[in-house]
Amino acid sequence: MRNSWVASRKGKTNVSQMHFARKGEITEEMRYVAKRENLPESLVMEEVARGRMIIPANINHINLEPMAIGIASTCKVNANIGASPNASDISEELKKLDLAVKYGADTLMDLSTGGVNLDEVRTEIINASPIPIGTVPVYQALESVHGSISRLNEDDFLHIIEKHCQQGVDYQTIHAGLLIEHLPKVKGRITGIVSRGGGILAQWMLYHYKQNPLFTRFDDICEIFKRYDCTFSLGDSLRPGCLHDASDEAQLAELKTLGELTRRAWKHDVQVMVEGPGHVPMDQIEFNVRKQMEECSEAPFYVLGPLVTDISPGYDHISSAIGAAMAGWYGTAMLCYVTPKEHLGLPNPEDVREGLIAYKIAAHAADVARHRSGARDRDDELSKARKEFDWNKQFELSLDPEKAKQYHDETLPEEIFKKAEFCSMCGPNHCPMNTKITDEDLDQLNDQIQSKGAAELTPVKLNKEN
């Protein structure tokens, strides 16, 4: 779809959506997004120019269907997949991609750390994906030197970053906000540093006693990104890994640096979103969202969860979806899903489905709460189908039609029950929506209440007996 769109841009020094928007040009990607979001094209251009909206769309990801992340658009959901040294199979990762797209993931991150050829699995995923793909390049940087922090140099990081751009990665998590002076602030935490990328860079800084190379070479990374229209996802290396560590000095010190880096990237006309926690008590979620907006000049916020309790292994997709819904309500632009396997192991395809559905619920709840245009239309349509006992339409409008039908059919599998005016919960005689009270009955009752008062009502026969 995008071949003709990007053909004229190749070879230019800056091909980012922000660059065109700031010149007053509405790109085909912006027009496409405007239609998807039901927004004016001019508003999309203005929001991208301002930095409040991003359209992650690498010029080398030709089969991409452009989408927007920002407070003016619907709340988005990211799904994570990726092979590890202990569990690796490219076909399994492609199956996870298919499931993620099927169940409505808006973006997807390939977090592969080993066990497969990382370039090969990334290329396969990008070629198969209609949604934006994100990566964490420091993983491959470490893998390229066989896990040796001592052999890892600044150029290794930049080489891998550009390779990911060349392959068509739409956004990259760049952990540039973690500074060497932040590391002592981690003392006193229960879980310390829980970001894998942050952990790699912390080890690198402590070994070499040098500043974070992603910070010192940040302008070089901007120069790379603008040639491909790759978007920054500024990583939160010091995100809290438990409730105890939430909103502490270390987290907020890094957030301040992330705000400074956001504005530096914007000077290059490079798109930015900012990553956030993590594990956060419910009463601190609003503070975290507001603080990010303040420090990062309203760049789109992209949060992992947050989990609102630490005692839910096996059910962390539920704990975190609670926090995610709240974060989305307060203005977070994209929610990174958590699966039931969080903290326990590598997710399988079924875990991907469970996590994604939980987060689609959270994102949709946020859209409804923020009164986004058309957000409740599907809810109202399903409610009408429920009132009319149109079971097939209820299944169709569900976030997970297959599961809705499966649960209904466990007790009433015969096709005749798809037209029944009851389910197995209430049976045919006790369903309150099955009572034959008509609008005419209610109008007649209201007339009597208005004329006589409730205490003096005369019994009337319903127009239709129950």
Curated annotation (Swiss-Prot):
Belongs to the ThiC family. Its cofactor is [4Fe-4S] cluster. It catalyses: 5-amino-1-(5-phospho-beta-D-ribosyl)imidazole + S-adenosyl-L-methionine = 4-amino-2-methyl-5-(phosphooxymethyl)pyrimidine + CO + 5'-deoxyadenosine + formate + L-methionine + 3 H(+). It comes from Prochlorococcus marinus (strain NATL1A). [4Fe-4S] cluster binds at residues 423, 426, 431. Binds 1 [4Fe-4S] cluster per subunit. The cluster is coordinated with 3 cysteines and an exchangeable S-adenosyl-L-methionine. GO terms for cellular component: cytosol. Zn(2+) binds at residues 279, 343. Transmembrane segments: none annotated. Keywords: 4Fe-4S, Iron, Iron-sulfur, Lyase, Metal-binding, S-adenosyl-L-methionine, Thiamine biosynthesis, Zinc. One of its GO terms (molecular function) is 4 iron, 4 sulfur cluster binding. This is Phosphomethylpyrimidine synthase. It comes from the Bacteria. Catalyzes the synthesis of the hydroxymethylpyrimidine phosphate (HMP-P) moiety of thiamine from aminoimidazole ribotide (AIR) in a radical S-adenosyl-L-methionine (SAM)-dependent reaction. It is an enzyme of class 4 (lyase).
